[in-house]
Swiss-Prot record:
The keyword Transit peptide does not apply. GO terms for molecular function: 4 iron, 4 sulfur cluster binding; iron ion binding; NADH dehydrogenase (ubiquinone) activity; NADH:ubiquinone reductase (non-electrogenic) activity; quinone binding. Belongs to the complex I 20 kDa subunit family. This is NADH-quinone oxidoreductase subunit B. It catalyses: a quinone + NADH + 5 H(+)(in) = a quinol + NAD(+) + 4 H(+)(out). Its EC number is 7.1.1.-. NDH-1 shuttles electrons from NADH, via FMN and iron-sulfur (Fe-S) centers, to quinones in the respiratory chain. Couples the redox reaction to proton translocation (for every two electrons transferred, four hydrogen ions are translocated across the cytoplasmic membrane), and thus conserves the redox energy in a proton gradient. It comes from Brucella abortus (strain 2308).
Length: 193
């Protein structure tokens, strides 16, 4: 291992990678995207992309979410930060301030008195900003749909990107909603929203 071998001169040692025990090849070696990327990197020595694609890629892997827990769905929202689900492995981490957040997760029953506060917090978030509506109450009023004091869906106050159904939805459902949001950002992502 080093700059010279026994019979040939090497620039660097050959990468070993993680071997698949079934095939004996490096993991990911049969992936078409991986092969194209590796081929371009070995041919040119660098990868060419647009700034817009690079920013969109970086944005999907570094989403900062702000909780707006209004009822029992907030308990399930807390679970995704714990070790069992570990949302940070998907590149999403909680923030306490709306000025540092990209994503707002509205979880629970939104009342008429709370609606202006929700809109004010949403307006404080920097662009591009995204909203995940979590649970039946946030999606459409839920159990309290016919109550005079409940907003029948937070989409009447703020624009919603992803709806997560359930009463309350599981932590897995919320993680799936976050992954769908990342997929949506990759598909429709632009520097300006």
């Amino acid at each position: 291992m080093g700059l010279t071998g026994t019979n040939t001169t090497l620039v660097a040692p050959q990468p070993k990678g993680i071997l698949d025990p079934r095939t004996g090849k490096t993991v990911g070696s049969d992936d078409a995207f991986f092969n194209d990327l590796n081929g371009e990197l070995s041919d040119k020595g660098f990868i060419v992309t647009s700034a817009d694609a690079l920013i969109t890629w970086a944005r999907t892997g570094s989403l900062m979410w702000m909780t707006f827990g209004l009822a029992c769905c907030a308990v399930e929202m807390m679970h995704i930060s714990m070790p069992r689900y570990d949302a940070e492995r998907f590149g999403i981490a909680p923030r306490a301030s709306p000025r540092q957040s990209d994503v707002m997760i509205v979880a629970g029953t939104l009342t008429n008195k709370m609606a202006p506060a929700l809109r004010k917090v949403y307006d404080q978030m920097p662009e591009p900003r995204y909203v995940i509506s979590m649970g039946s109450c946030a999606n459409g009023g839920g159990y309290y749909h016919y109550s005079y004091s409940v907003v029948r869906g937070c989409d009447r106050v703020v624009p919603v990107d992803i709806y997560v159904p359930g009463c309350p939805p599981t932590a897995e459902a919320l993680l799936y909603g976050i992954l769908l949001l990342q997929k949506k950002i990759r598909r429709t992502g632009t520097i300006e929203r």
